[in-house]
Amino acid sequence: PRLSSAASDVYKRQVEMPFNPMSVALGAEASFVARSIDMDRDLTAHVLEEASKHKGSAFIEIYQNCNVFNDHAFEQLTSKEGRVANRINLVHGEKVIFGAEDELAVTIEDGEAKIVKRADIDDSQIYVHDTTKKNPSVAFSLSRLSHGPYGPTPVGVFRQVERETYNEDVIGQIESAKEAKGDGKIEQLIRSLGTWDVN
């Protein structure tokens, strides 16, 4: 669905299909990706704490209400009824179950995350969330369950994998070059072949 806001007559409807920030981050192989809601202090504190412990960069999407331009934009996730009906809490190692009476669940079928009624499946088919999967495809599929805060929406940590950071890789590359060719000297570099005089 295209998104719109009643805040301005000029910008009633967005022409372009907005991209999904979570999907972009996961598609770019981000090693830590999470989503929270500004009004949920406990969830936000948990997500920020996990991000601070993560080695490397962390991407966090926070649904933040703006009472000027888009007030009540996240009511489907923050209202008393919406919180129970639509929030899909992702907790590492736990089955993904939600709904007012835990009547809904998430399954992974053919690599795609789907929302199903628990009455229609066996509990063994319910997806058990794993933030440490090296392959981001499941996390990516979870990010596609919603596009904006409308209807059932996953929140929490989607992906949290350990790997060498960019900084560590660059330092390692420099150290390897030093071992192979020595420390190198700037004067030697300046006077090396391939230089010329400008008259």
Residue ranges of predicted features:
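Structural motif
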Residues: S23, S31-A34, S57-F59, T153-V157
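Conserved thiamine diphosphate
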Residues: D9-E50
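Flexible, low-complexity linker and terminal segments
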Residues: V68-N199
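Single conserved hydrophobic/aromatic residue that forms the stacking wall/gate
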Residues: P1-A7, Y11
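Structural signal for hydrophobic packing residues in well-ordered secondary-structure cores
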Residues: L26-E29, L48, S52-K55, S146, ...
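ATP/pyrophosphate-binding catalytic subdomain of soluble kinases
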Residues: A34-N89
